[in-house]
Swiss-Prot record:
Induction trigger: Up-regulated in the hippocampus upon chronic methamphetamine treatment.
Subcellular localization, as worded in the UniProt entry: Cytoplasm; Membrane; Nucleus
Protein name per Swiss-Prot or TrEMBL: PH domain leucine-rich repeat-containing protein phosphatase 1
Gene that encodes the chain: Phlpp1
Protein species of origin: Mus musculus
Biased composition (Low complexity): 78-96, 1424-1445
Amino acid sequence: MEPAAAAPAQRLADPTGEDQALAAAAAEGGRCPDPALSAAAPSGGNGGAAREEAPCEAPPGPLPGRAGGTGRRRRRGAPQPAAGGAAPVPAAGGGANSLLLKRGRLKRNLSAAAAASSSSSPSSASSAAGGLPASCSASASLCTRSLDRKTLLLKHRQLLQLQPSDRDWVRHQLQRGCVHVFDRHMASSYLRPVLCTLDTTAAEVAARLLQLGHKGGGVVKVLGYGPPPAAAPAASDQTLDGEHGRDVEPPPSSGTVGAVRGPARAPPADLPLPGGAWTRCAPRISPAPSDSSPGELFAGGPGSPPRAPRPASDTESFSLSPSAESVSDRLDPYSSGGGGSSSSSEELEADPAMPHRPGRPAQPRPPSPKTSALLQPKAPTGVDSTGVIAGEGPGDDKAMAAAAPDVPLSTSGRIRETVQKTSPPSLYVQLHGETTRRLEADEKPLQIQNDYLFQLGFGELWRVQEEGMDSEIGCLIRFYAGKPHSTGSSERIQLSGMYNVRKGKMQLPVNRWTRRQVILCGTCLIVSSVKDSVSGKMHVLPLIGGKVEEVKKHQHCLAFSSSGPQSQTYYICFDTFTEYLRWLRQVSKVASQRISSVDLSCCSLEHLPANLFYSQDLTHLNLKQNFLRQTPTLPAARGLGELQRFTKLKSLNLSNNHLGAFPSAVCSIPTLAELNVSCNALREVPAAVGDMQNLQTFLLDGNFLQSLPAELESMHQLSYLGLSFNEFTDIPEVLEKLTAVDKLCMAGNCVETLRLQALRRMPHIKHVDLRLNILRKLMADEVDFVQHVTQLDLRDNKLGDLDAMIFNNIEVLHCERNQLVTLNVCGYFLKALYASSNELAQLDVYPVPNYLSYMDVSRNCLESVPEWVCESRKLEVLDIGHNQICELPARLFCNSSLRKLLAGHNRLARLPERLERTSVEVLDVQHNQITELPPNLLMKADSLRFLNASANKLETLPPATLSEETSSILQELYLTNNCLTDKCVPLLTGHPRLKILHMAYNRLQSFPASKMAKLEELEEIDISGNKLKAIPTTIMNCRRMHTVIAHSNCIEVFPEVMQLPEVKCVDLSCNELSEITLPENLPPKLQELDLTGNPRLALDHKSLELLNNIRCFKIDQPSAGDASGAPAVWSHGYTEASGVKNKLCVAALSVNNFRDNREALYGVFDGDRNVEVPYLLQCTMSDILAEELQKTKNEEEYMVNTFIVMQRKLGTAGQKLGGAAVLCHIKPDPVDLGGSFTLTSANVGKCQTVLCRNGKPLSLSRSYIMSCEEERKRIKQHKAIITEDGKVNGVTESTRILGYTFLHPSVVPRPHVQSVLLTPQDEFFILGSKGLWDSLSIDEAVEAVRNVPDALAAAKKLCTLAQSYGCHDSISAVVVQLSVTEDSFCCCELSAGGSMPPPSPGIFPPSVNMVIKDRPSDGLGVPSSSSGMASEISSELSTSEMSSEVGSTASDEPPSGVLNESSPAYPNEQRCMLHPVCLSNSFQRQLSSATFSSAFSDNGLDSDDEEPIEGVFSNGSRVEVEVDIHCSRAKEKERQQHLLQVPAEASDEGIVISANEDESGLSKKADFSAVGTIGRRRANGSVAPQERSHNVIEVAADAPLRKPGGYFAAPAQPDPDDQFIIPPELEEEVKEIMKHHQEQQQQQQQQQLPPPPQPPQPQPQPQPQPQPQPQRHFQMDHLPDCYDTPL
């Protein structure tokens, strides 16, 4: 049978790099930049195979496959070809475009495609058929591809998306799911969805994909073990596209996999797999499906020869084809860098938004999986299956064996074939774009994926199921069918091209010149053996130790020779002299290297590569972060036992592999001096390690060791033994015999008691590291000193007291972050003392430490500086900040060695008056109570370069000199947030070297121009928050000025800052600018100009056009008005400031009208040192939250899911980078859209939210760092290494943060979520980045914002304060001001539990009742009416309105009913300000007969009332409506047993009309006159009455209109359409009816309730009279202090 002609193929290119590939192709005359050649298998079993190079114009898409027989798919609607008839082969000259045109694939630029088809010459066709590189018309082909690339790529990817029927099948059962597999059996990387169950194994999935080969891409369904499933409904068994399908029959006995095409719409058949598994395949038939033929083999499968891709050009690096084995699999690894597998380059199309499933029952959360058992393969105990801790990887990906030492080089190409024929099909898993691990046959891919997602933080199985169906999950966890392509390997390819090659000696006439592919990769020369450069063997020539020589007999010819007895020589003729020189220089460098060090780290190795053994002279071998095991699973693979062949090996790194057991073979290497087996889940060390006599460094960190063998004592040269982060509970005794070890490294273990007796037996130990243990005490059995220990590290333990006097030779002591109250240290040789973040009240060092140079006792409780500190002669740095020190001793400044004194955040009222000459260079006294600095401070401190006296009470500055000459070298002066006036400005001229000046938020009104002119060295000035009206023009004299910050002033004239040549940042926001004058050319370095907050500023078109060239130009946007329906409850302002190296690594998010305009969303994102992650979060997070809100309404759930999905959306950027984030969402009550609002905050990292409630800060965030006990335990369980600076693997100190996926599972994105119901006492909340909260406490931040009415100015103030206090990081602050009115807040109903949570400490009085919304554990309180804090009213009401519109009068009469003393009134009821709970015997106001208006009361009209209009009942501009808004009447039966009968009087002059009240309801209501409290002002000006209307709102004539300021504020002029009018002729009739109802009500109440012990006497309506003062004072004494409502 004739072999089928090969149809062109093109791999799915990376969209981000496709344009570069096109450019490269154009440069090379149209040659394909990244070819992937498809292998055609004969349909009859003959060994022939025709291959064809892919033309460059083949667009990305599903592979057309090979033509031939019935394998060709027909176009939809095309006639069915006859059986056995071969489909027509497209003309070779037409290339890919002609083929795609026939199938209807090209929708755009058909004329260009036709031109490309017709312009191809027969010569190009013949060259393509012959296997040579095709030369095509670059103009036509590239033009067509550039136009159609997006459309074709999108259509191709749409074919890969799951259809609704696929998703419905998965959602039908929680045991089902979807994994996306890159099917490398296809001729291009193909993301194939595989539907499976939790029981489906990796072997079943791999076998099924092997059977499909490179046939048409579609969704594969593998059902797992068991008998053939019964016939399912047609809806589920239908082909997944819903239109076409085909049956898949079991494979024939010959072993080849056939695909028999069936009729359309036929359900797929069940396919048995090896081992009893059954599969169901439903490939989707598309308008352009892939061709397939029965019996053809998948590319790269068993029996197919290995391939090497053809290069893109003759000289430049080329990209490896993912459809064939990586060329680097046959390369020599001896390169200096370990180019490991990098982040995945594929960027996948996102799935459309998953539809919400209404009515889906809440699935129970699965048990929280143990981290150590989440992703468990068949591996040694404690080994993680995803490759985090343990597992097994693919083969030698960075450098695969070309030939073993005993195998001739020419046969190297057959080794891979042998391995391929013997190894079963495999499935690989890759985490966060790093190394890949081969799954064992019985591992379950879906279970692995689900466990990974649960580790991220998802809580529900159905949500994990949905996330698994998204193809974008590949950046987190990805599966491969076949060994994945290593991007890092292609980076090692230095040179490549197609040249004339000759092998052997030049004198032999047999070896003729042939054109072959030549590649210089790493340190090897690779030459293809056949013409098409992808089939057959690849000859590898090691160049290290070899030579490269010029061949003079031939032009541009070089001779490459390898070293050794079996050396080979290749002669290569280059086309140009440039290529000749390039190869000569590069190969000469490689050949001159020596084989001594090999780096194979991060190569996904599961066994040792064969070419590693080319040389036995290796001295350093790095194999870290692979999947090596004690015994490889492949029988022909080389295990760790082969390492003993390296008889000269000195250093071996096996860390972060999956050994599970100690590799005993390394004990036979006598020369080994350094061995690293950290993080390998080792549980014991064998006794054979004693044979390594020359071992000097032995690293065993990050394992599960609890003991060490006694044989270690024979390691006499061992000087370093790493035992950190294991499971030791005590110091191993064998260390007593290891006399060369001088450092005890046992950080992160489980030591509770340090037995000093054990240390005494180890006199060789000088340095003891026991940080991050659980030490509680030091046990000294004897009084003898431990004289040999010089450095002691006890950080992050649980010590309460530490007596270190027993260490009499101690030099360095670390005891930070303990619980120390007292500390005693021996000072004989003490050089450094670190004791910050404790509770120290007493610090004794004896004797005086004469060698002490550094001392940090900040963040303690010290009240004075110890006397011995002043006597320490060599002290250079003293940090006593954040204590309670009231005075600094004068002798401290006399210390000639003191250079840096940090005394901020104390209680200093003054500094020593008379200072002698001091050597202090840095003085920080910020955040104290200093009113003035010593008058001679700046004159005596002639070495002072830095002074920070911010946040004090300074009114003036001391002079720098008493004459015109000055010796001041002061360069940085920070005086922000003081009381400085204009008088201090002339004193600044005494510091001519001043570079940075911060005088923000003082009382400056002017800055004299003459004084500014003398500060010529000034580079940065911040004079914000003053009352300046202008900046002097002499600022132009400061030629080095680069930053001018002057926001929040009264500046009216734009300063001359644009004349400064070095200016970069100008901030003139929140001023009174009306116009600006600009030069013709802006300063060349200007990067930021902020003009926001200038409402009168008007810019012409020319100025705007000029300013828009600035990188960051901020100006107020024209107001478009509030969105319809948006509540006037919040407004915001935000600011951002650059940090180190002027990089802005923060971003802010503010959406005032989120979703339906009744929600808001704010966020702050901090990337620390990277810019990419914050911007990605800013652009994406709001969309993710909107999608999550469609899936769930639970605050914690949708916030958690938003952060976890964002982890996926970060893509490859989040694999190595990360960032902190805080997100705040405001949403209304879903039932009552005009009611209360809920604020939900979620954060990771150190970004935080602080709410100001009633003037006090309330933190809504939490920082997860190593000081957090629960996080510390979690990190230690994962065996992560915590460096001495408290960072996970030295990367980040936050254990919960977005990004940094390579640190999974130690670092996760699950946020802290907290929700709180907003109340009228909530004034604003602040979102800030790490830099803000590191510099400001939450109390100071809240106090600073409270004094600023404008949100933008408040955010600016926070940023300026942080910078002046010493922050050098990027800062972002968002201030959201709240205006929650009383009408939008109600807390009457109890939480579901019915129990009240405890009050928040320090925020509310203990007697206050509180309600928490859905989160009883967060401790956030909501004030009740009885607390008095709910009595604040809207500012819209005035005192005159209060006096004129109140329809009731004050009375000193007792209430008409009293409570039964034996039972409390509503013991479990919570009331809001609209419905207060009455306090017995409290001062009250009584209503005048429940009337429409006080005009009809018995007391007559008030003085300001007017006569009402006939037929309209009102009380002026306010109305009263009675509505049962809290459904209180539903509880009346329960309450009646607590109430006494109170007869109600019927009024003949007023009418009561109750909403939601019928006749039966009227007869059953109880009187609530005994359930009152103190009178309370309303938004409508009335006072809460003491009758049943406590639970209703009184009725009136006007229908209420909701206003932002008040709940029932009616218009001043009543609208006739909105009035509730009773015609005069019906008024009397209505009165009679209501009177009759009231009489019936009284009778029923008397029948239902027992008579009271003392029936109250009817009280006449009281006349207006003053209230008795004694009673009022008595009652007010019992109210909280915040209750100040005037009556």
